[in-house]
Amino acid sequence: MAGPRACAPLLLLLLLGELLAAAGAQRVGLPGPPGPPGPPGKPGQDGIDGEAGPPGLPGPPGPKGAPGKPGKPGEAGLPGLPGVDGLTGRDGPPGPKGAPGERGSLGPPGPPGLGGKGLPGPPGEAGVSGPPGGIGLRGPPGPSGLPGLPGPPGPPGPPGHPGVLPEGATDLQCPSICPPGPPGPPGMPGFKGPTGYKGEQGEVGKDGEKGDPGPPGPAGLPGSVGLQGPRGLRGLPGPLGPPGDRGPIGFRGPPGIPGAPGKAGDRGERGPEGFRGPKGDLGRPGPKGTPGVAGPSGEPGMPGKDGQNGVPGLDGQKGEAGRNGAPGEKGPNGLPGLPGRAGSKGEKGERGRAGELGEAGPSGEPGVPGDAGMPGERGEAGHRGSAGALGPQGPPGAPGVRGFQGQKGSMGDPGLPGPQGLRGDVGDRGPGGAAGPKGDQGIAGSDGLPGDKGELGPSGLVGPKGESGSRGELGPKGTQGPNGTSGVQGVPGPPGPLGLQGVPGVPGITGKPGVPGKEASEQRIRELCGGMISEQIAQLAAHLRKPLAPGSIGRPGPAGPPGPPGPPGSIGHPGARGPPGYRGPTGELGDPGPRGNQGDRGDKGAAGAGLDGPEGDQGPQGPQGVPGTSKDGQDGAPGEPGPPGDPGLPGAIGAQGTPGICDTSACQGAVLGGVGEKSGSRSS
């Protein structure tokens, strides 16, 4: 038992070795040829349109294009709508001191101010001292003054006379010259003396020296309006003052005249791609462009499925009936005629109406074929007849036998068109005949009715993207579209620097004090000051008509007491517009405005020339399709009669028939029937 168990692993190893050797000896063969294509499968149903994908990321900015040629100035556009007043910007830094401008002309007098005394003005310069005044009148005597203070001790008096001793004295007299004694103590103040008499008028004193200029007195009451003086000399420009506060926004002015269109500037760099706006309205179709140059013919695509037959068109209208031809008598069978000579080219005859069908005579013996005649000129195409009633469907015809290809004969004279026969059933399709030589190009038939939409063929391979065509010429300028709606107001840009300070104007005439109003509104000012302004203008006009004569300088009046401070004045009228400031830095990009209306469609550019791409790899073999079911298509619309075909080769001479019998009764009946129909047609 131990022997067989030990041999089992060895047998397994030998079997595995043989299997591995056999597997190594096998090699992979060459791939076989592709199998035949399977039948086409059923056309798939149209899939549901997918949802619109999210907008793609904005692409990188393209290179800056070459600057275009400046275009012709366009027509002046309609005046724009008045803009919206912008927000008040911040005051810019003061500008540099400009050169003094020319002095402006004297403006009209301003409106009088509101009631109330203004703030006192700055002290004026000291005036020139006037001439000395004359001798004034003697004033009245003044009141008695208070007792004065004791004066200082006076100088020692002169020596007194020698005194005399009184009687009984034994003393000697003092010498004549005695030394002065010491000064005595100050005496008591004396009593008020009696009032002295009024002294006489003294002499006129000399003019004193010019005193120092006194302090400026308070502003006096405003005087009446004086005459307008002559225009003074132009003063020196004052120093540049600090920038004033920004005044209130002025009233909106009338829209200005649109200026001439400027030259087209250089093309700027492409900005960031904006958000996709809503779909605009369909624009008006533009003018038809010039036909483009035909591109090279592309490679034939995959053949599509046969479309369904079109709806049968309406039958053409029945043509005018031809004039009745004289019915010929039925003759006996003629002998074979001699070959006739080639007839000369006949003139083009008028197209006659179709005659009535005569009774078919017995077949005569075929004549000897004559020489082929000269081909006649091609007749003009007749008018298309109106659509007639649809006839009943005839029985299906027997399948024809495939004929041999004949030689192309010369074109014969056009035959008279026969009457339109009844429409027969669609016959079975016979075997395809051999392709004949290409005939002469026939007259173009009228466009048939459009057929039903054929089944969708299999989608072809996607060709390579052709190169973009050259840019078309600039089309004519379209008519100006309606003005678009104004966009959203953008963020106000930073304020520009302050403009140069203008030359101070000539001070106007001081107006009369107005009546203090309750409200300093514009309407209130107009109501209060309308008449006063008219009166001031009338007075000014009257004074201007008079000759100007400088008046004498009046005496300065006494300085009045300072008046109480008046109420603050109302906001003045907006001043004249200053010069334009420097251009500020470019503002930030605003939000994209609403999408404008779609413009007119431009002219169609020239067709681009496509390039044939490289042939693609052969695709994998499709799955086996389901065999399709064939359906007979609908009959197509009958086309217009084509040009007469080439005459065929003369046929073989047939067997001679039996002699016929001439029966004139049928001919007479045909004649009578034709005359009756002719008269009936005329009467109708």
Curated annotation (Swiss-Prot):
Key word Repeat present in the record? yes
Query: Region Triple-helical region 3 (COL3): which residues?
Result: 29-519
Q: Where is the composition biased (Basic and acidic residues)?
A: 200-212, 264-282, 344-356
| Record Pfam families | Collagen
Give the start-end ranges of region Nonhelical region 1 (NC1).
662-684
Look up keyword Transcription and say if it applies. no
Where is this chain compositionally biased, Gly residues type?
130-139
Please state which protein family the record places this protein in: Belongs to the fibril-associated collagens with interrupted helices (FACIT) family.
* Record's subunit section: Heterotrimer of an alpha 1(IX), an alpha 2(IX) and an alpha 3(IX) chain.
Q: What is this protein called?
A: Collagen alpha-3(IX) chain
Q: Which organism is it from?
A: Homo sapiens
